[in-house]
Structures are given as C-alpha cells and as structure tokens.
Amino acid sequence: MFTRRLGPDPHANGASTPSLRGCPDILEMETGDFAVIGKDITGEAANRLIAGASCGPDERIVWIPRKTLVLAKSDIPEGA
C-alpha cells in the first residue's frame, strides 16, 4: 500500500513527540498518490474554507506542521 515516506522520519535524531503513534507524516502510495497523517481539523475548519474549496462527506481536512511539508518538498516528484 505505501512505498515510501516523503521527508525525514519525524523521530529521526531523537526528535520527541507525544508518542510514536502521533506524528505528522506524508507517505507515497503504490498508486503514486499520497496519504497524509496529521490532526483532523474538519470539524473546526469545514465552514471556514477558502472560496471554491469544499470537503466531501468521505473527506477530512488534515493539519500538518509547515515544517513537515517543507522538509518533504525535495522528495515530491515533478509532473503529473
């Protein structure tokens, strides 16, 4: 299902988080799509989305720290 992590391991170099099961992460899937592990903020953010954005009943708005995405940038493939 998942082929690799984009960006560094959130626990690398002894980084501490509340638990090994509670870290933001970006994973590439076998299909080439991506999965994001983060905090579900759908309840508080769904009514505050920018114009043209929407969240369907089977979707969630997920928050990840800026640092997580910035550090993954070099691992994100170019093109479609």
Label each residue range with its predicted role:
Residues 4-7, 27, 37, 63:
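Residues in well-ordered beta-strands of folded domains
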Residues 16-59:
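A short, structured beta-strand/loop element
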Residues 1-23:
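Short, charged/polar N-terminal "headpieces" of proteins
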Residues 7-10, 30, 38-40, 68:
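Generic secondary-structure microfeatures
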Residues 53-80:
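C-terminal structural segments of small proteins and small subunits
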